[in-house]
Regions:
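Glycan-processing catalytic domains of CAZymes
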Residues: 1-189
Length: 189
């Protein structure tokens, strides 16, 4: 999966994003890439045309390339057509446990959970990570692609980088996801 920043639909041009995509394919080759992670994705109708162009471009290169879009929040429903997977939540673990897409977002439930993703940071313990994973597995959240880390980020001060390293409980995270997928007891922390 190749990372491409999109500047929320205003910070980069479509041609610059396409150039990034082309460079990844030229450097790594199609056989090394499963798709593209479009970060800093807009979430409003105002930027939808920008993402339609990018999605069409990627699928025109190869229909099998997977597109993961990261608005980090619930975008307007039409965004479901410009990514194969949408990150509908990016934030603190404590906020994710209260996350409820049901209000005004019926489109979320028309998609399989494999089309929804969450990125949780500040899950400072294995138990906090497991709470977030259990929340993702509920019908309410309908989220199939999950990641949690104990690394910290403070939005108010823009300090920390929760994506700099794998979490200290990486093995427990993998075991937790596996157990939830199988419907078995979660591993101990």
């Amino acid at each position: 999966m190749a990372y491409v920043a999109t500047g929320y639909g205003t910070g980069r041009s479509v041609s610059a994003v396409k150039q990034n995509i082309d460079n990844y394919l030229r450097y790594y080759g199609r056989n090394q890439l499963s798709g593209f992670f479009l970060d800093e994705m807009g979430a409003t109708s105002q930027h939808l045309a920008f993402y339609k162009q990018i999605y069409s471009y990627i699928k025109g290169l190869d229909e099998e390339l997977r597109v993961i879009g990261n608005p980090g929040t619930l975008p307007v429903a039409d965004y479901a057509g410009v990514a194969d997977v949408l990150v509908t939540f990016e934030g603190k673990a404590s906020d994710y446990t209260r996350f409820n897409p049901q209000d005004g977002n019926a489109w979320v439930y028309a998609k399989p959970n494999a089309a929804q993703a969450m990125l949780v940071h500040n899950a400072t313990s294995c138990a906090a990570m497991q709470t977030a994973m259990r929340a993702a597995a509920t019908a309410r959240n309908n989220t199939g692609l999950v990641y949690a880390t104990d690394l910290l980020y403070d939005f108010a001060t823009n300090t920390g980088n929760p994506w700099a390293n794998l979490p200290s409980y990486w093995t427990s995270l993998l075991g937790t996801v596996s157990a939830l997928n199988r419907g078995t007891a979660l591993p101990g922390c």
